């Protein structure tokens, strides 16, 4: 995409606007300067960038740049990095979804200070009005009489009433704005699973009071193909996390998805369905599914995979995970893991003789896939190796290079850009894969890693305690 490969960490907080912090380390030729610019992902505004903000190079590490910017509206955005260095000028764009997710209460100390300042302003306004009514037309040195004092009192009362009404109306206006903001806060679409035998049907939709049943289904044409499929579905047996399936339900015409499930141990499964909407906005829809005992299963699809690690109650999994065919996935596990810290987590696939696997193949166009799942169910992330790109990033790259994205027009299903836009190079793949990730909170996590050799998709499982 660019002359330099760039690793980026972004943290944001939604409070009506989004403040993003960026830490960038280019992995190419030395960089002298770097700027960052927020732009809408699509539309006319994406063609007219604002003035860029300069990023600051570290005094101790000139290759490390840091900066921040505000995104002032919700939607699908791109953050563009423009670089100048030994290799010339270059740029990279990163898709960033910006949505309000919460309402935050004002801190009491701030509220008290603002209330005090407001009272001061009101009293000052009333005092000025009273002084004007009492003394504005007096000759210098004259003393106001009783009539002027009474008039000043009347004017002061009217001024105070005016301020009180203005404050009341302002409060009403603010409450309406807050209610509108709350109504527009981002909420993931709802995933509704239904199991008939081993036939799984999935519908994605949103509450809609205008719809006949109060619920409106999402059209499949509103979704983008990402890594060869419209939907990536993880099914993890709960609460022991001792069975995991990475499936890819096929679209059912205009709405919904379906899949003939493989043989699955009975129990309750947490479902995590990754989809990307046409505006570039990714979502992970969640639901639960109960699989009955004795369910007849179909063979796994060519792109599907599964694993049966030991249950959480059996103890923590180590840094090496033995696979059924004798291969092993080994994690270069850091000595300590802390929350909100960026890591580049490396995993190695070894053959039965303990040597690096020599027949590596891309899995869904990637060198590997990872799922980081917190054992209390509060966090899930499906990630890809360092240097890979999601569909919104591929769209940005093709637009910047003048390439057309088939399927971005019309109903969007036929010929949509898929693996051809992001296939790995024909060079031999390394048996070592690194996943950039930062654990969002302290606690216990189970990590599922998938790599492919020959025609076999391997799934390893690992446990992590994050401080």
PLM-predicted stretches and their roles:
Residues 1-138, 143-160, 166-467:
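N-terminal soluble domains immediately following signal/targeting peptides that reside
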């Amino acid at each position: 995409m660019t002359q330099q490969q760039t690793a980026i960490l972004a943290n944001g907080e939604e409070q009506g606007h989004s403040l993003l912090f960026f830490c960038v380390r280019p992995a190419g030729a030395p960089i002298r300067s770097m700027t960052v610019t927020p732009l809408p992902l699509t539309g006319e505004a994406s063609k007219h960038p604002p003035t860029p903000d300069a990023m600051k190079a570290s005094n101790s590490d000139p290759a490390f740049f840091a900066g921040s910017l505000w995104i002032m509206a919700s939607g699908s955005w791109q953050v563009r990095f423009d670089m100048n260095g030994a290799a010339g000028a270059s740029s990279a764009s990163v898709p960033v979804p910006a949505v309000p997710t919460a309402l935050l209460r004002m801190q009491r100390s701030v509220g008290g200070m603002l209330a005090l300042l407001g009272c001061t302003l009101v009293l000052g306004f009333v005092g000025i009005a009273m002084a004007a009514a009492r003394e504005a037309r007096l000759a210098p040195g004259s003393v106001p009489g009783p009539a002027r004092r009474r008039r000043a009192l009347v004017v002061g009362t009217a001024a105070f009433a005016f301020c009180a009404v203005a404050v009341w109306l302002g409060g009403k206006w603010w409450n309406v704005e807050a209610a509108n903001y709350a109504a527009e806060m981002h909420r993931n679409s709802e995933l509704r699973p239904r199991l008939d035998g081993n036939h799984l049907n999935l519908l994605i939709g949103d509450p809609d009071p205008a719809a006949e049943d109060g619920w409106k289904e999402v059209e499949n044409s509103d979704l983008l193909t990402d890594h060869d499929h419209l939907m990536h579905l993880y099914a993890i047996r709960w609460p022991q996390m001792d069975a995991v399936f990475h499936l890819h339900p096929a679209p059912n015409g205009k709405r919904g998805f379906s899949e003939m499930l493989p043989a699955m141990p009975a129990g309750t499964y947490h479902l995590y369905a990754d989809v990307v909407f046409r505006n570039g906005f990714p979502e992970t829809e969640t639901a639960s599914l109960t699989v009955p005992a004795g369910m007849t299963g179909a063979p796994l699809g060519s792109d599907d995979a599964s694993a049966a690690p030991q249950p959480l109650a059996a103890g923590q999994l180590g840094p090496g995970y033995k696979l059924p065919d004798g291969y092993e996935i080994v994690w270069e596990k850091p000595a300590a893991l802390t929350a909100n810290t960026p890591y580049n987590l490396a995993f190695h696939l070894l053959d039965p003789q303990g040597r690096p696997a020599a027949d590596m193949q891309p899995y869904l166009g990637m060198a590997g896939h990872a799922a980081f799942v917190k054992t209390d169910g509060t966090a899930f992330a499906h990630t890809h190796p360092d240097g890979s790109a999601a569909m919104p990033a591929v769209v940005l790259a093709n637009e910047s290079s003048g390439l057309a994205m088939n399927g971005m027009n019309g109903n969007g299903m036929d010929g949509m850009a898929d693996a051809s836009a992001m296939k790995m190079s024909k060079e031999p793949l390394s048996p070592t894969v690194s996943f950039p990730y930062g654990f969002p909170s302290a606690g216990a996590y189970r990590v599922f890693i998938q790599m492919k050799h020959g025609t076999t998709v391997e799934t390893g499982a690992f446990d992590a305690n994050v401080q």
